[in-house]
């Protein structure tokens, strides 16, 4: 398996943040982004990869290692903001908030995908960036672990939707629960399965 590395970062100079988001597709819960900066790019953390390729246990171990050696920021866009704007604009908002939370003077921002937020720093969009850039892959892990923890908290309030397992995604089990129990304030009303249930 090929792992991300610092090739993209090393082509640039200065302080470089990697940014990624988690939670664009679910029917419930916020979208969360993380921004990660490795000040010392000689730092080696074995196993960093796109969070979707890692087990929950592996993500948790890597998360702890990343936050112990890297600078990071977290940004969230709430369900209310997703409902008010749309998921794309809410995602960009969460990315911008992650960079603000990072609170560093940056030279470049590497963003996974092709729809970056408008920020004051130079931005490079990297399609499949979480497979190429260590900084972006690390951001994907930090964002994923953060959101999974939040969905666990929401699960404790609404266990009937089993968000601990499905993380708010539109699984058959989740859709059946919506049919039985209706929707909560944590559901995205402008997503088709939810809007049809209203």
UniProtKB/Swiss-Prot annotation:
Cite the cofactor comment.
Manganese or magnesium. Binds 1 divalent metal ion per monomer in the absence of substrate. May bind a second metal ion after substrate binding.
Q: Which reaction does it catalyse?
A: Endonucleolytic cleavage to 5'-phosphomonoester
User: Which PROSITE patterns does this one have?
Assistant: RNASE_H_2 (PS51975)
Q: Which UniProt keywords apply?
A: Cytoplasm, Endonuclease, Hydrolase, Manganese, Metal-binding, Nuclease
Q: Identify the EC number(s).
A: 3.1.26.4
Write out the GO MF terms: manganese ion binding; RNA binding; RNA-DNA hybrid ribonuclease activity
- GO annotation, cellular component aspect: cytoplasm; ribonuclease H2 complex
- The protein's superkingdom reads Bacteria
Q: What is one process in the GO biological process aspect for this record?
A: mismatch repair
Q: Which InterPro entries match?
A: RNase_HII, RNase_HII/HIII, RNase_HII/HIII_dom, RNaseH-like_sf, RNaseH_sf
Q: What is its main location?
A: cytoplasm
Q: Which cofactor does it need?
A: Mn(2+); Mg(2+)
Domain annotation RNase H type-2: ranges: 14-198
Entry keyword annotation includes Glycoprotein: no
Annotated a divalent metal cation binding lies at 20-21, 112
Q: What does this protein do?
A: Endonuclease that specifically degrades the RNA of RNA-DNA hybrids.
**UniProt family annotation:** Belongs to the RNase HII family.
Name listed for the protein in its UniProt record: Ribonuclease HII
* Gene of this entry: rnhB
